[in-house]
Amino acid sequence: MKKGGAIVNGNNYFPPQKEGRLYLSEGGTETELMYKYGFDLPQFALFPLLNNPDAVLKMGEMFRSYLEVAAKHKVSALIGGLDYRASPDWGELLGYSPEGLAEANLQSIEFIREIANEYASEIPGILVQGLVGPRGDAYERNENITENEAEDYHSVQLETLKKADVDLALAITFNNIPESVGVAHAAAKIGVPLGISLSLDSSSKLNSGPSLVEAITAIDKETDQSPEFYMINCSHPFEYEPAIEPDDWINRVRGVRPNASKMEKLALCKLGHLEEGDPVELGELCGNLARRYPHMDIWGGCCGTWNSHLDEIAKNVIVP
């Protein structure tokens, strides 16, 4: 179906993989707006910027630059990015009522759809995703949250994303098993397709301790494989490459959204400026991974990346 003119599936449906079809996602939206454009992001939240006309213009330019890359390389797009912090605890810290937070999340999705509409004839398929961030800080262990608490907590935002008719909810920068299981249970009950993107640290493991294979195996076991797929994000290839093995479980991993820099995450946060790394090298590393695992079909960027990085990634992951 078409929604707002952009080519999307709607009806909370995420399409199966199709040979030759690749998706390009957004880059590191928060770091780009903070350090490239100079906007303040309390609690690292983007959606409040929808109340700032200057920020709306810059965000429009930013998302168009991502979609221009998809159009240039003739790949599909899986686009989102304003609602990472649009969950109850973060909304309360930002001064939003539950009703106001839900409305802000709906406005975030509509903003993305309006931008996507401009590229409906240039990109072979545009899907819209809502981003579900962890309840706590992504760089903490977040070990205290239980599966049931996570299910209750994330149900709030997932209900809003279902109402927004997103093609996918992406639980992104998750770093422990119980919260991942809880958000998967919530999505399954509500009826929203869910991807889970896990973040690995410099030890090539989740910050809470398990390896990538241990986490995916455990989550799938507890959820009867209800997540549509898994991804890796907020990690540089030097961090996640040692965790990737040529075994059956890796087929559950459909994509990667790497950080631009090789620096350790906490050190990166303390820099106070944008660390863009080496976009050419990043693209080549992603290309190497794509050739080894051609089933991976979702590529994008995370902290420190923007359209230049996405261009290098897209150029390299398109396997002839």
Task: Please report, for each region that a protein language model flagged, where it lies by residue.
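Domain-level signal for soluble alpha/beta catalytic cores
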Residues: 2-320
